[in-house]
Amino acid sequence: MCSIAKDIGIDLGTASVLVYVKGKGVVLNEPSVVAIDKNTGKLLKVGAEAQAMLGRTPGNIVAIRPLREGVISDYDMTERMLREFLHKVVGGFQLFKPRVIICVPSGITEVEERAVVDAGIQAGARRVYLIEEPVAAAIGAGIDISKPDGHMVVDIGGGTSDIAVISLSGVVESASIKVAGDQFNEAIFKYMRRKHNVLVGERTAELMKMQIGCVFPKEQETTIEIKGRCLVTGLPKVINVSSTEMLEAFEEPVERILEAIHGVLERTPPELVADISNNGIVMTGGGSLVDGFDKLIEARTGIHTIVAEDAISCVAEGTGKSLDSLNDMQDGTVNLSRRKQMN
């Protein structure tokens, strides 16, 4: 039994869940996947063990992602997944429940917010607070958001891309679009079917994205050998795919992200745009690691763009750092991003 309740920060992402424990840092990074027995409803595996079962389960076992496009699509499975992860991190805490901050996309609705809060409470939290992902990402990237200075953060996760201009600990202008890492994988599926008549699995698409995926021309082309099923013969097929092909495959989702960035800049007050020109654009999230994304944004906006150090963990780190402000929260506070109490 845990003797002292721990404050916990959770990056509840479509692709992964990262858990930050106060005083310890990020202690868990697992895929947002659960495996269940359809006949009994029994939860079999969560996280990495469940992900390994994607596309490889017998008829009575199904591996699913309970979050889609940044929000809960299966409430029961999300609650059970969170319960397992929290138990793994802090053990039994029936008498000493933790306070928890959970990250959410900036465009989330009140109904979706309530679903996240309720899932956290049912999973074992004493109290649940929310923080918008770009705010947490900025804090995790080391940006001092309390100053009257404009900063732009582009957080590309698994289900959503969140773009925000932040100043004085608040979001001045933002956009959240359902185009991110999952849509890049979907673009690979479509491209492989259209160009090669080959069907590839989810894990293969993820491998292609991370090894040869790019959104800006590379100085030296790279290739990868992939295995899939030929749609003509129905038999296994091995082909080589190049990074140049990924440029073509990713064109549509990349353009939508660029349009969202341009839209936020257009709506931002001129003084803050000047600040952003000086401070640059900071990218976070797993999607920011697709090769050349920073170069492309810089080329299209004319603003210096960098990928944050440890971009995948920035949101979780920022959530964790926000735990220090919980004692200052007023009763009834739910979404920390809408109250300037982060400093």
Task: For each feature predicted by the language model, list its residue ranges.
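Nucleotide/phosphate-binding catalytic cleft detector across ATP-hydrolyzing
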Residues: M1-I156, A164-I281, S288-N343
